[in-house]
Protein backbone atom coordinates (compact mmCIF):
# COMPACT_ATOMS: atom_id res chain seq x y z
CA UNK A 1 0.00 0.00 0.00
CA UNK A 2 2.81 2.29 0.79
CA UNK A 3 4.48 1.74 -2.56
CA UNK A 4 1.27 2.56 -4.43
CA UNK A 5 0.83 5.83 -2.58
CA UNK A 6 4.38 6.88 -3.44
CA UNK A 7 3.85 6.12 -7.11
CA UNK A 8 0.67 8.15 -7.22
CA UNK A 9 2.42 11.06 -5.59
CA UNK A 10 5.24 10.84 -8.12
CA UNK A 11 2.73 10.70 -10.94
CA UNK A 12 0.81 13.70 -9.61
CA UNK A 13 3.99 15.80 -9.20
CA UNK A 14 5.33 14.99 -12.66
CA UNK A 15 7.64 17.18 -14.71
CA UNK A 16 4.87 17.95 -17.25
CA UNK A 17 3.14 20.41 -14.95
CA UNK A 18 6.38 22.21 -14.07
CA UNK A 19 7.27 22.60 -17.74
CA UNK A 20 3.84 24.03 -18.51
CA UNK A 21 4.17 26.59 -15.72
CA UNK A 22 7.58 27.66 -16.93
CA UNK A 23 6.33 28.07 -20.50
CA UNK A 24 3.38 30.17 -19.23
CA UNK A 25 5.75 32.44 -17.28
CA UNK A 26 8.11 32.86 -20.21
CA UNK A 27 5.40 33.62 -22.86
CA UNK A 28 3.85 36.88 -21.47
CA UNK A 29 7.16 38.77 -21.26
CA UNK A 30 9.63 37.40 -23.83
CA UNK A 31 11.74 40.58 -23.62
CA UNK A 32 13.03 39.81 -20.06
CA UNK A 33 16.61 38.74 -19.72
CA UNK A 34 17.58 35.15 -19.18
CA UNK A 35 18.68 35.85 -15.62
CA UNK A 36 15.09 36.40 -14.51
CA UNK A 37 13.98 33.11 -16.03
CA UNK A 38 16.80 31.27 -14.29
CA UNK A 39 15.81 32.78 -10.96
CA UNK A 40 12.16 31.86 -11.42
CA UNK A 41 13.01 28.22 -12.21
CA UNK A 42 15.23 27.95 -9.16
CA UNK A 43 12.45 29.29 -6.95
CA UNK A 44 9.87 26.89 -8.35
CA UNK A 45 12.22 23.96 -7.86
CA UNK A 46 12.77 24.94 -4.25
CA UNK A 47 9.04 25.25 -3.58
CA UNK A 48 8.31 21.87 -5.19
CA UNK A 49 11.04 20.18 -3.17
CA UNK A 50 9.68 21.63 0.04
CA UNK A 51 6.12 20.48 -0.71
CA UNK A 52 7.39 17.02 -1.63
CA UNK A 53 9.25 16.67 1.66
CA UNK A 54 6.20 17.69 3.65
CA UNK A 55 4.00 15.17 1.87
CA UNK A 56 6.46 12.37 2.59
CA UNK A 57 6.44 13.21 6.28
CA UNK A 58 2.63 13.14 6.36
CA UNK A 59 2.42 9.75 4.65
CA UNK A 60 4.93 8.22 6.99
CA UNK A 61 3.03 9.26 10.09
CA UNK A 62 -0.53 8.50 8.85
CA UNK A 63 -2.30 5.02 9.24
CA UNK A 64 -2.86 2.66 6.27
CA UNK A 65 -6.66 3.16 6.09
CA UNK A 66 -6.38 6.77 5.17
CA UNK A 67 -3.84 6.40 2.37
CA UNK A 68 -6.35 6.48 -0.49
CA UNK A 69 -8.12 9.68 0.46
CA UNK A 70 -5.24 12.06 1.48
CA UNK A 71 -3.01 11.73 -1.57
CA UNK A 72 -5.66 13.31 -3.79
CA UNK A 73 -5.88 16.35 -1.54
CA UNK A 74 -2.13 16.69 -1.42
CA UNK A 75 -1.93 16.64 -5.20
CA UNK A 76 -4.16 19.69 -5.48
CA UNK A 77 -2.25 21.79 -2.89
CA UNK A 78 1.12 21.99 -4.68
CA UNK A 79 -0.55 23.07 -7.94
CA UNK A 80 -2.37 25.93 -6.22
CA UNK A 81 0.86 26.96 -4.43
CA UNK A 82 2.75 27.01 -7.71
CA UNK A 83 0.13 29.16 -9.43
CA UNK A 84 -0.03 31.62 -6.51
CA UNK A 85 3.78 31.89 -6.48
CA UNK A 86 3.82 32.60 -10.21
CA UNK A 87 1.26 35.43 -9.80
CA UNK A 88 3.30 37.08 -7.05
CA UNK A 89 6.39 36.95 -9.21
CA UNK A 90 4.53 38.71 -12.01
CA UNK A 91 3.55 41.54 -9.65
CA UNK A 92 7.11 41.93 -8.36
CA UNK A 93 9.00 42.58 -11.57
CA UNK A 94 12.62 41.97 -10.74
CA UNK A 95 12.39 42.87 -6.99
CA UNK A 96 14.54 40.62 -4.86
CA UNK A 97 12.51 39.05 -2.03
CA UNK A 98 13.69 39.56 1.56
CA UNK A 99 13.75 36.66 3.96
CA UNK A 100 12.05 37.07 7.38
CA UNK A 101 15.30 36.16 9.14
CA UNK A 102 17.06 39.22 7.68
CA UNK A 103 14.20 41.51 8.71
CA UNK A 104 14.37 40.29 12.32
CA UNK A 105 18.12 40.81 12.40
CA UNK A 106 17.79 44.36 11.12
CA UNK A 107 15.11 45.33 13.66
CA UNK A 108 16.93 43.68 16.55
CA UNK A 109 20.21 45.61 16.09
CA UNK A 110 19.48 49.40 16.22
CA UNK A 111 22.27 51.78 15.27
CA UNK A 112 24.01 53.08 18.39
CA UNK A 113 25.80 56.48 18.21
CA UNK A 114 29.52 56.37 18.82
CA UNK A 115 30.59 57.48 22.30
CA UNK A 116 31.82 61.11 22.53
CA UNK A 117 35.58 61.54 22.78
CA UNK A 118 37.08 62.37 26.16
CA UNK A 119 37.61 66.12 26.70
CA UNK A 120 40.83 65.70 28.62
CA UNK A 121 42.45 64.02 25.62
CA UNK A 122 41.58 66.76 23.09
CA UNK A 123 41.77 70.01 25.16
CA UNK A 124 45.31 71.10 26.00
CA UNK A 125 44.34 73.14 29.12
CA UNK A 126 42.65 70.21 30.87
CA UNK A 127 40.25 71.16 33.70
CA UNK A 128 40.27 74.94 33.14
CA UNK A 129 36.83 76.58 32.96
CA UNK A 130 35.48 80.04 32.24
CA UNK A 131 34.90 80.86 35.92
CA UNK A 132 38.50 80.07 36.78
CA UNK A 133 39.73 82.33 33.99
CA UNK A 134 37.56 85.22 35.24
CA UNK A 135 38.82 84.86 38.81
CA UNK A 136 42.41 84.85 37.63
CA UNK A 137 41.88 87.98 35.49
CA UNK A 138 40.29 89.88 38.41
CA UNK A 139 43.24 88.99 40.68
CA UNK A 140 45.70 90.28 38.10
CA UNK A 141 43.76 93.57 37.78
CA UNK A 142 43.75 94.08 41.57
CA UNK A 143 47.48 93.49 41.80
CA UNK A 144 48.13 95.98 39.00
CA UNK A 145 46.04 98.73 40.65
CA UNK A 146 47.77 98.20 44.02
CA UNK A 147 51.19 98.43 42.40
CA UNK A 148 50.21 101.68 40.66
CA UNK A 149 49.02 103.24 43.94
CA UNK A 150 52.29 102.34 45.67
CA UNK A 151 54.25 103.87 42.83
CA UNK A 152 52.31 107.16 43.02
CA UNK A 153 52.86 107.39 46.80
CA UNK A 154 56.62 106.91 46.38
CA UNK A 155 56.75 109.57 43.66
CA UNK A 156 54.96 112.10 45.92
CA UNK A 157 57.41 111.47 48.78
CA UNK A 158 60.36 112.09 46.47
CA UNK A 159 58.89 115.33 45.08
CA UNK A 160 58.05 116.81 48.53
CA UNK A 161 61.01 118.80 50.03
CA UNK A 162 62.55 117.65 53.29
CA UNK A 163 61.22 119.59 56.35
CA UNK A 164 63.61 122.25 57.68
CA UNK A 165 64.50 121.74 61.40
CA UNK A 166 63.03 124.52 63.52
CA UNK A 167 65.18 126.86 65.60
CA UNK A 168 63.42 126.16 68.92
CA UNK A 169 64.43 122.50 68.72
CA UNK A 170 68.14 123.40 68.63
CA UNK A 171 67.79 125.91 71.49
CA UNK A 172 66.19 123.31 73.76
CA UNK A 173 69.14 120.94 73.30
CA UNK A 174 71.69 123.65 74.24
CA UNK A 175 72.51 124.24 77.98
CA UNK A 176 70.43 126.77 79.85
CA UNK A 177 71.87 130.25 79.90
CA UNK A 178 70.72 133.83 80.28
CA UNK A 179 67.56 134.44 78.40
CA UNK A 180 68.34 136.37 75.28
CA UNK A 181 66.41 139.61 75.19
CA UNK A 182 64.42 139.92 72.04
CA UNK A 183 64.77 143.17 70.14
CA UNK A 184 61.87 145.43 70.93
CA UNK A 185 59.80 146.41 67.96
CA UNK A 186 59.77 150.02 66.97
CA UNK A 187 56.04 150.29 67.47
CA UNK A 188 56.42 150.00 71.26
CA UNK A 189 58.52 153.14 71.79
CA UNK A 190 56.81 156.47 71.04
CA UNK A 191 58.53 158.57 68.46
CA UNK A 192 60.63 161.33 70.07
CA UNK A 193 61.39 164.38 68.03
CA UNK A 194 65.01 165.40 67.71
CA UNK A 195 65.95 168.86 68.98
CA UNK A 196 66.02 171.40 66.24
CA UNK A 197 69.14 173.50 65.69
CA UNK A 198 69.11 177.08 67.08
CA UNK A 199 69.25 178.62 63.64
CA UNK A 200 65.87 177.22 62.74
CA UNK A 201 64.46 178.34 66.07
CA UNK A 202 65.65 181.90 65.44
CA UNK A 203 64.04 181.91 62.02
CA UNK A 204 60.77 180.80 63.53
CA UNK A 205 60.93 183.52 66.17
CA UNK A 206 61.52 186.20 63.55
CA UNK A 207 58.42 185.23 61.61
CA UNK A 208 55.43 186.97 63.15
CA UNK A 209 52.89 184.48 64.35
CA UNK A 210 49.83 184.44 66.45
CA UNK A 211 49.83 183.78 70.17
CA UNK A 212 48.82 180.14 69.72
CA UNK A 213 51.78 179.42 67.42
CA UNK A 214 54.18 180.95 69.94
CA UNK A 215 52.79 178.76 72.73
CA UNK A 216 53.27 175.67 70.58
CA UNK A 217 56.92 176.49 69.94
CA UNK A 218 57.61 176.95 73.62
CA UNK A 219 56.03 173.62 74.48
CA UNK A 220 58.06 171.79 71.83
CA UNK A 221 61.32 173.33 73.03
CA UNK A 222 60.64 172.21 76.59
CA UNK A 223 59.99 168.63 75.48
CA UNK A 224 63.22 168.59 73.50
CA UNK A 225 65.21 169.78 76.52
CA UNK A 226 63.74 167.07 78.74
CA UNK A 227 64.52 164.40 76.15
CA UNK A 228 68.22 165.33 76.03
CA UNK A 229 68.79 164.73 79.77
CA UNK A 230 67.28 161.21 79.86
CA UNK A 231 69.03 158.56 77.63
CA UNK A 232 66.77 156.64 75.26
CA UNK A 233 68.32 153.19 75.83
CA UNK A 234 67.84 153.16 79.62
CA UNK A 235 64.16 154.06 79.51
CA UNK A 236 61.37 151.64 78.90
CA UNK A 237 58.09 152.51 77.22
CA UNK A 238 56.24 152.80 80.55
CA UNK A 239 58.86 155.10 82.10
CA UNK A 240 58.70 157.41 79.15
CA UNK A 241 54.97 157.76 79.47
CA UNK A 242 55.23 158.54 83.19
CA UNK A 243 57.92 161.18 82.78
CA UNK A 244 56.09 163.00 80.05
CA UNK A 245 54.64 166.21 81.33
CA UNK A 246 50.96 166.86 81.00
CA UNK A 247 50.08 169.27 78.32
CA UNK A 248 49.16 172.74 79.24
CA UNK A 249 45.61 173.72 78.75
CA UNK A 250 45.39 176.25 76.03
CA UNK A 251 43.01 179.06 76.63
CA UNK A 252 40.47 178.90 73.89
CA UNK A 253 39.00 181.98 72.40
CA UNK A 254 35.70 182.92 73.93
CA UNK A 255 33.08 183.32 71.32
CA UNK A 256 30.67 186.14 71.88
CA UNK A 257 27.37 184.78 73.02
CA UNK A 258 24.53 185.49 70.73
CA UNK A 259 21.82 187.64 72.07
CA UNK A 260 18.76 185.70 72.95
CA UNK A 261 15.97 186.70 70.74
CA UNK A 262 12.54 186.89 72.30
CA UNK A 263 10.38 184.08 71.12
CA UNK A 264 7.27 184.97 69.30
CA UNK A 265 4.21 183.90 71.18
CA UNK A 266 1.56 182.45 68.98
CA UNK A 267 -1.88 183.91 69.54
CA UNK A 268 -4.08 181.40 71.19
CA UNK A 269 -7.46 180.65 69.78
CA UNK A 270 -10.35 182.16 71.57
CA UNK A 271 -12.12 179.66 73.71
CA UNK A 272 -15.68 179.07 72.76
CA UNK A 273 -18.40 179.05 75.38
CA UNK A 274 -19.33 175.80 77.10
CA UNK A 275 -22.62 175.49 75.28
CA UNK A 276 -20.99 175.74 71.88
CA UNK A 277 -18.36 173.09 72.75
CA UNK A 278 -20.87 170.38 73.54
CA UNK A 279 -21.78 168.32 70.50
CA UNK A 280 -25.29 167.97 69.27
CA UNK A 281 -25.43 164.47 70.68
CA UNK A 282 -25.55 165.92 74.20
CA UNK A 283 -28.95 167.47 73.60
CA UNK A 284 -31.91 165.59 75.06
CA UNK A 285 -33.54 163.19 72.68
CA UNK A 286 -37.22 163.03 71.87
CA UNK A 287 -37.81 159.54 73.19
CA UNK A 288 -36.13 160.51 76.45
CA UNK A 289 -38.38 163.54 76.76
CA UNK A 290 -41.48 161.50 76.07
CA UNK A 291 -40.71 158.80 78.58
CA UNK A 292 -39.56 161.24 81.19
CA UNK A 293 -35.85 160.69 80.82
CA UNK A 294 -36.02 156.99 81.50
CA UNK A 295 -34.43 154.59 79.03
CA UNK A 296 -36.34 151.46 77.96
CA UNK A 297 -33.50 148.98 78.76
CA UNK A 298 -33.61 150.09 82.35
CA UNK A 299 -36.93 148.35 82.80
CA UNK A 300 -36.41 144.90 81.26
CA UNK A 301 -32.80 144.01 80.61
CA UNK A 302 -33.70 140.44 79.60
CA UNK A 303 -35.58 141.31 76.40
CA UNK A 304 -33.67 140.55 73.15
CA UNK A 305 -34.51 143.95 71.64
CA UNK A 306 -33.09 145.72 74.66
CA UNK A 307 -29.81 143.79 74.35
CA UNK A 308 -29.38 144.97 70.78
CA UNK A 309 -29.93 148.55 71.82
CA UNK A 310 -27.42 148.24 74.63
CA UNK A 311 -24.78 146.94 72.26
CA UNK A 312 -25.43 149.80 69.85
CA UNK A 313 -25.14 152.38 72.60
CA UNK A 314 -22.01 150.81 74.15
CA UNK A 315 -20.03 151.35 70.95
CA UNK A 316 -20.05 155.03 71.61
CA UNK A 317 -17.53 156.21 74.18
CA UNK A 318 -18.90 158.19 77.12
CA UNK A 319 -15.96 160.62 77.05
CA UNK A 320 -16.83 161.98 73.62
CA UNK A 321 -19.65 164.09 74.97
CA UNK A 322 -17.50 165.73 77.64
CA UNK A 323 -14.55 166.53 75.37
CA UNK A 324 -14.36 169.99 73.80
CA UNK A 325 -14.37 170.35 70.05
CA UNK A 326 -10.69 171.30 69.82
CA UNK A 327 -9.49 168.18 71.66
CA UNK A 328 -11.56 165.64 69.78
CA UNK A 329 -9.63 163.23 67.57
CA UNK A 330 -9.55 163.99 63.91
CA UNK A 331 -11.21 161.57 61.58
CA UNK A 332 -9.09 159.98 58.91
CA UNK A 333 -9.55 161.40 55.45
CA UNK A 334 -10.91 164.80 56.52
CA UNK A 335 -8.93 168.00 57.09
CA UNK A 336 -11.30 169.52 59.61
CA UNK A 337 -10.03 170.84 62.97
Swiss-Prot record:
Species this protein is from: Bos taurus
UniProt xrefs under Pfam families: JSRP
Amino acid composition bias (Low complexity), ranges on this chain: 165-180
Gene this protein is translated from: JSRP1
Quaternary structure note: Interacts with CACNA1S, CACNB1 and calsequestrin.
Domain of life per record: Eukaryota
Higher taxonomy: Eukaryota, Metazoa, Chordata, Craniata, Vertebrata
Biological process according to GO: skeletal muscle contraction
Name of the protein in its database record: Junctional sarcoplasmic reticulum protein 1
Keyword flag Chaperone: no
